[in-house]
Amino acid sequence: MKKLLSLPPNLVECFHDIEKADQTEWFCTSDPIGSKLGSGGGTAWLLEACCQKVAPDSDFLTWLGKEKRILLHAGGQSRRLPGYAPSGKILTPIPVFRWARGQRLSQNLLSLQLPLYEQIMEKAPSSLHTLIASGDVYIRAGQPLQTIPDADVVCYGLWVDPNLAKNHGVFVSSRATPDKLDFMLQKPSVEELGKLMQTHLFLMDIGIWLLSDRAVSLLVKRSYKEGKLSYYDMYSDFGLTLGEHPRTMDDELNKLSVAILPLPGGEFYHYGTSRELISSTLAVQNLVNDQREIMHKKVKPHPAMFVQNAEVGYQLTSQNSEIWIENSYVGAGWNIHHQTIITGVPANNWNLEVPSGVCIDVVPFGESGYVARPYGFNDTFKGALAKEETYYQGMSVGEWCAVRGISVEEIENGHDLQAARLFPVCSSVEELGAVMRWMVSEPALQQGKEIWQRCRKSVSYTHLRAHETRRHLV
């Protein structure tokens, strides 16, 4: 079964090498640089790119009907999970579950996601050739899958409380016909859901959609405007046209048949933010508390603490909560508190104070360079630098600059924090340590300031995602 992945640009060229993936089974591409296609337009782009690559002489609809396939959208901007933006969230390493057998130390989000999607497609009727899912979630089915009906669109959902559903898409069905979609809503209020519950049932959309060839062709058709592939969202645009009483009228799309299925024993874990990286991993680890089933005998100082492929000389204690250390060296001279993610740090002898809520990331650059890339646990990498509400490391960018004796104007591309040329490329681990100290906890450190001002800073969050070689990160 072919897998089609939409990935960050830097990951496309080396994905097959890194994952040891068969090129005949896995197809990878990225959205055109600078374009915003949305999940619908991105689906059209991914499918058409694959068709052109593997069957250039075939008609698109003919190619669609030849085999089943799984599409994973994993090329998002990762503004809220900066630590894994350069490498792609879908390859985020996930700790072995303490209660599970047969897992791999090298497992990642992709390897955990895929078995359920393959199981669904194997069970799906022959008319459903395409499954579309998101790359930043881990979804489990604790019970056997039910029969999948023959419809143009089949969507899976979860029974959830209205307070959780209000942040997601929602499938609304009549209590008389719970397996048929009445209409879809996007982020409805708790009050709206409360009124609907008198006559309707609702399931939270978990992003697993199966489409017939007819539905795919119409989705692709709607993704084009004036002959050009444009922004089209599969959920807020395409989804709202579906159901018995759709919220958006469209003569062709309104005629698509739709079935809604609750995922049996379903569990949904989102890995979209730094906080969710830890909270979702903790939730999965805590699925089993029966000590007879838990194979890991070592007790961590704090349950929300995850260390993988790392050498840690610093003594972690129960005071260190929401800690994630991966592929890094943390020496005895470090001081860590809580809400900290540490990734990619090379061997060092630094004395580094890491404030609560500050994360440390190092990205290799070129053959021997290092990019110092600290950020805040809750940073969203969004907004113009001059705006008071644009935060970096838990404070406004203006405040961060002021305490370090620099001006916001010194940072190029200040129209958006994601594009800002903020991160210095250092030539040695020693330079890296000094500039990191200045950027996170020692604003008066003149040596760090001089390195930051001297070093090449044409490196932004966007630049790293688009150009850094992923091979160096594994």
Ranges and model annotations:
Residues H463, E468-V474:
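Single conserved hydrophobic/aromatic residue that forms the stacking wall/gate
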Residues M1-H16, E67-G83:
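N-terminal nucleotide-binding beta1-loop-alpha1 segment
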Residues L64-K66, A85-G88, T92-S223:
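Conserved core of the sugar-phosphate nucleotidyltransferase
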Residues N10-C14, Q77-L81, Y138-A141, P162-L164, ...:
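Flexible loop/turn segments at secondary-structure boundaries
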Residues M1-L5, I18-W26, F60:
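N-terminal, positively charged, Ser/Thr/Ala/Gly-biased leader segments
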Residues K2-L7, G34-D59, V153-V154, W159-N163, ...:
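Left-handed beta-helix
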Residues T29-L37, F97-W99:
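A short glycine/serine-rich beta->alpha loop
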Residues L4-L5, K68-A74, H129-D136, I260-L261:
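Extended hydrophobic secondary-structure segments that form protein cores and membrane-embedded regions
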